[in-house]
Amino acid sequence: MIKGIGIDAVELSRIKPIVEKQGSFIQRVLTPNELTLFEKLSTKRQIEFLAGRFACKEAFSKAWGTGIGKVGLQDIEVLTEKTGAPYVANSPHNGKVFVSITHTETMAIAQIVLESE
């Protein structure tokens, strides 16, 4: 049974200056494991990655029904399968979590579906 669905979109133009300055926002959004993946990418891919992960965590908080104030960005970890598919490795949700992230030239969009146990 579906517990919640969340979707979020992030403009890449808002993330680009953050990546270029290597600001503290990056450490607030990404877990240490996500940061390891992030650091291996080109600047263009870092912008897409950070925007996608932020959108994913926002979408999770919407699906969870609390918003980001009740669940922290560090509480949700989105890693990558060998195939390139994202998956939620850690979260406060005990059931299954389905994630989809897509990018255009200007946006990153993520959708989360939470399934109850």
Curated annotation (Swiss-Prot):
GO biological process: fatty acid biosynthetic process
Example GO molecular function: magnesium ion binding
Record carries keyword Ion transport: no
Residues noted as binding Mg(2+) in the record, renumbered to the chain: D8, E58
Catalytic activity: apo-[ACP] + CoA = holo-[ACP] + adenosine 3',5'-bisphosphate + H(+)
Highest taxon above the source species: Bacteria
A family per Pfam: ACPS
Its EC number(s): 2.7.8.7
Intracellular or extracellular location(s): Cytoplasm
Listed NCBIfam families: acpS (TIGR00516), pantethn_trn (TIGR00556)
Keyword annotations: Cytoplasm, Fatty acid biosynthesis, Fatty acid metabolism, Lipid biosynthesis, Lipid metabolism, Magnesium, Metal-binding, Transferase
InterPro entries: 4-PPantetheinyl_Trfase_dom (IPR008278), 4-PPantetheinyl_Trfase_dom_sf (IPR037143), ACPS (IPR002582), Ppantetheine-prot_Trfase_dom (IPR004568)
Name assigned to this protein: Holo-[acyl-carrier-protein] synthase
Disulfide bonds, paired cysteine numbers: none
